[in-house]
């Protein structure tokens, strides 16, 4: 299996992010997504470390990961794995669940990340084939089709409840303060001692309560913020070297390595495919 990846934004659903990739040796570092991650495994076997357990997703399976929940991914077999992913917004899936249940509800909750639903897998694979075309000739038709498939995914496999069965533990009041501090100073360099002084908590306790609330330790959340900013700023013509420094990375090499570990493609590839 040849390692290759293409990431782009489709015009449907207000720039839906799409990733088609094949990997053998590449592994995704532990990270989170702002939106839902809905993927299909088209070849090989993927391993996903999620909610404290390692799950395997073979060819023909669907993988759904909740927004904000930390996870890492890698090839479960030597031959690697190929997958297609879309990242529908939380609001979109929530609206679909409201339509399905006809009552106000929380964010859809998927109890298991790996789903076996062959008919839905085949339908999603067909939708991805249409998404991969250089130009989408009938955006309305494709958007309607994808909405139908996502509604089917939610109705068959999400928990229909007003409250998610997986609620985070009590959130220490300083967690939001540290999150806000990192969000407004993401380009700066910090040590855990810096954040400890900022919060008034010991480094160990801060790391524990932050991970429990956010799904990532503070340093990984800082990387998440930088990657999110990079995705936005790659739409501009700023040089990658300057962008790396502006975002707080040591240099372009550090930026490139980190971006690929989180997104699956290099910053240069991501920028080039934004224009497709």
What are these regions (language model features)?
Residues 51, 76, 96-100, 156, ...:
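Residue-level signal for well-ordered alpha-helical positions
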Residues 176, 180-184, 188-193, 201, ...:
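Terminal helix-turn-helix DNA-binding modules in bacterial transcription factors
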Residues 105-121, 131-199, 212-220, 224:
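Short, Lys/Arg-enriched, Trp-marked, Pro/Gly-tolerant hinge/linker segments that flank
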Residues 37-40, 89-92, 123, 145, ...:
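Amphipathic, well-ordered alpha-helical segments in soluble domains
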Residues 2-106, 133-136:
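N-terminal regulatory/effector-sensing and dimerization cores
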Residues 124-128:
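Short, Lys/Arg-enriched alpha-helical recognition elements, typified by the DNA-recognition helix
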